[in-house]
Amino acid sequence: MAVRIEVLKEDNRTRARLGKLHTPHGVIETPVFMPVGTQATVKTMTPEELKDLGAGIILSNTYHLFLRPGHELIREAGGLHAFMHWDGAILTDSGGFQVFSLGDLRKITEEGVEFRSHLDGSKKFLSPEIATQVQMALGSDIVMAFDECTPYPATRDYAKASLERTTRWLKRCQETLTTTDRQALFGIVQGSMYEDLRKQSAAEITELDLPGYAVGGLSVGEPKELMYEVLDYTVPLLPKDKPRYLMGVGSPDALIEGVMRGIDMFDCVLPTRIARNGTALTRYGKLVVRNAESAHDFSPIDPTCDCYTCKNYSRAYLRHLIKADEILGLRLMTIHNLRFLTNLMSEIRAAIKENRLPEYREKFFYEYGYLK
Ligand SMILES: CNc1nc2cc3nc[nH]c(=O)c3cc2[nH]1
């Protein structure tokens, strides 16, 4: 079954859309934040807990699963859904980004990327064909094309050569898939921070009439304002009747700003990663629970939050667990941060529905401390 978006409403003052993403493993309301489960687990969460938190789609990484335990073992297990006991939707990133940011990069050629595994230093090779075959073995619902996430900053010449290779690689991914499986393949627009190159990449990628499109090459160290500027001129180049996915984003403010610019799907490791080192997301900004200020604070992280952690535990207790390296601390902080984000996204969807997204943004940014 094809992956498709049903756009229910287009905001009248911004580019935001309310939608339903139809996948072989369920229908997901958009805009949506996808928790990241890099190694076939959203760290410290059981699938049942993820469902309770409101997650309907998670991200997993081809690079990591290719290196360990290997896609053949997961195929043997009946695919990633069976292997990890998750019956919701799964989107897999293709590995290109992870090779550049994790592996000991050896060489990029037209054929693919040679690299050393970050696990044991052994030589590995990923190509559009291999990355696509791995994702099919995993049985993922949304397959990301194997691309080069153009590093930032990049010269115009490098960015142009890189996007053109990404387009050639996308066509090779498409050719690797059967016609039915092609309905799961999302293309990724590159072009770094050059408007004309983004136009070129978007034109080349959308010509292939894919089920969805990602804006890549962002959240790679550029200032947020520059990311928003690139979105301002890139998102309108993507078809309105297809899902738009901003890769690697993000923080609450970036989620709102991305939705305002027409993005439907987001993923980011930040919320779960900062949770594990004791930082909680709240509507008033970040709360570093491990700091001394919480030592005698017997109130919850956020009294307005409906999560299991905020209903049952104090900041003082969470600070103790984190400082004592207690595993329960990792779990309780993760539960809170994921629930915060699924609540944020449902508030954003309600604001779009009721034509009050700009007002919601103002209120959120003021409370969150972004507007002094
Ligand atoms: C955390 N930031 C971030 N995560 C990304 C993942 C990506 N995957 C494929 N292609 C990308 O361009 C890409 C960009 C990204 N930025």
Swiss-Prot record:
Name the needed cofactors.
Answer: Zn(2+)
Question: Cellular component GO terms, alphabetically?
Answer: cytosol
| Keywords, in A-Z order | Glycosyltransferase, Metal-binding, Queuosine biosynthesis, Transferase, tRNA processing, Zinc
What's the top EC group for this one? transferase
Q: What is its EC number?
A: 2.4.2.29
User: Which reactions does this protein catalyse?
Assistant: 7-aminomethyl-7-carbaguanine + guanosine(34) in tRNA = 7-aminomethyl-7-carbaguanosine(34) in tRNA + guanine
What is the recorded function of this protein according to its Swiss-Prot or TrEMBL entry? Catalyzes the base-exchange of a guanine (G) residue with the queuine precursor 7-aminomethyl-7-deazaguanine (PreQ1) at position 34 (anticodon wobble position) in tRNAs with GU(N) anticodons (tRNA-Asp, -Asn, -His and -Tyr). Catalysis occurs through a double-displacement mechanism. The nucleophile active site attacks the C1' of nucleotide 34 to detach the guanine base from the RNA, forming a covalent enzyme-RNA intermediate. The proton acceptor active site deprotonates the incoming PreQ1, allowing a nucleophilic attack on the C1' of the ribose to form the product.
Q: What is this protein called?
A: Queuine tRNA-ribosyltransferase
